[in-house]
Amino acid sequence: MPNANAIANVFKLIEENNVKFVLLRFTDIKGKEHGVSIPVSLVDEDMFEDGKMFDGSSVEGWKTINKADMLLMPMAETAIVDPFAQIPTLSIRCSVYEPTTMQSYDRDPRSIAIRAENYMRSTGIADQAFFGPEPEFFLFDDVRFNVSMNKASFSIDDIEAAWNTNKKYEEGNNAYRPLKKGGYCAVAPIDSAHDIRSEMCLILEEMGLVIEAHHHEVATAGQNEIATKFNTLTLKADETQIYKHVVQNVALEHGKTACFMPKPITGDNGSGMHCNMSLSKDGKNIFQGDKYAGLSETALYYIGGIIKHAKALNAFTNPSTNSYKRLVPGYEAPVLLAYSASNRSASIRIPAVTNPKAIRVEARFPDPLANPYLAFAALLMAGLDGVVNKIHPGDAMDKNLYDLPPEELKDIPAVASSLEEALNSLEKDYEFLTQGGVFAKDFIDAFISIKRKEVERLNMAPHPVEFEMYYA
């Protein structure tokens, strides 16, 4: 049933902010946001019970044209004033429902996230799953690309880019920029985006997110990170969509363009989205214990589930062909499926904490192109499978995995090396996702089909590097 207090708050926000339109936002399979704007005169309490009809056949991977009608079901508790709309607009996040049954749609990512949380509670293992993602992004000055029968090119430029040390600017080249792999926690004047990130943080706070820190990241050409406080799974996925919305729009206001691709530039670090996770029951962190690095047995089993299902998980946590250009040795990307305390070369890390109650597990392979609803839900389901089936991850690996000799490396499993491998793995290893009806098999098949088209398109396209290697 709709939350009466939350609905009352919607009308309070409308009155206090002179709102003219209500924007109903929803997320598709690929993680892209869509929206339908409603004049405020048509917004009433019934809307939160009856929903708003829309054409599901126009969203890739959803309905066919002969069965197109679907419902946007507004979640009143997510209502927030959009700070970027010139006409006062209230945004409300929606789940997607079937109008014939008034049940959540099995291909709606937000509904999948909710079902994952409900399934977790039904197992009795935990009543809350906390997620703290760390999406990194680039801020570029200029991005161009061209794909046609006889051309394939892209061009990126930014005032901070290391390749601009010899560029002539009308106002002169001040030479303050991070060189390759030289940007981590840089300060002004090398960090040119400090005030832009600060503005992003202030707006994110206005929209309900809790900011923990922001800083320049490792790569040249304007790589950044804003750290926000954890939240429960679905709410944190909502917040991740808000995060991207704010980053992109503030960047635009400053003449920049924000890029969440994992590997937009060659030869420097890519952008990840490390995911911190913990489970709570009756208000207690059940990952806290007396095993390795202060973990509980439950936490170790959770890690075991993620490692076991990692290649299938990659389809959701690293859902682009570009993702696997980041997941290569040499750029601080976690390729090997091992766990360790504070060891950033492992794909599963147990961060150091000053308070044992804050103990958590960090999956380091996800990237910011992941649909947060699907990625978080899939990670939770893999972890729960580990707990239910007592999948122990084996011994921790505390050594630098990047420096291991070949004879040791061969015994350590790795993440998928391509989107195609990840999809093949998901095709074979999916039953952990369908427990409790969280991910429908029909949805998994649709997701694989959509992503295979992306793989096929890239496989069929000649690449400029091929001309460099093979033309003459």
UniProtKB/Swiss-Prot annotation:
Binding locations of Mg(2+) 1: E134, H274, E362
Cofactor note: Binds 2 Mg(2+) ions per subunit.
GO terms, molecular function: ATP binding; glutamine synthetase activity; metal ion binding
Cofactor dependency: Mg(2+)
Top-level taxon of origin: Bacteria
Principal location listed in the UniProt entry: cytoplasm
Residues that coordinate or bind Mg(2+) 2: E136, E217, E225
Reactions this protein catalyses: L-glutamate + NH4(+) + ATP = L-glutamine + ADP + phosphate + H(+)
NCBIfam families per the UniProt record, alphabetical: GlnA, PRK09469.1
Protein name: Glutamine synthetase
Species of the source: Haemophilus influenzae (strain ATCC 51907 / DSM 11121 / KW20 / Rd)
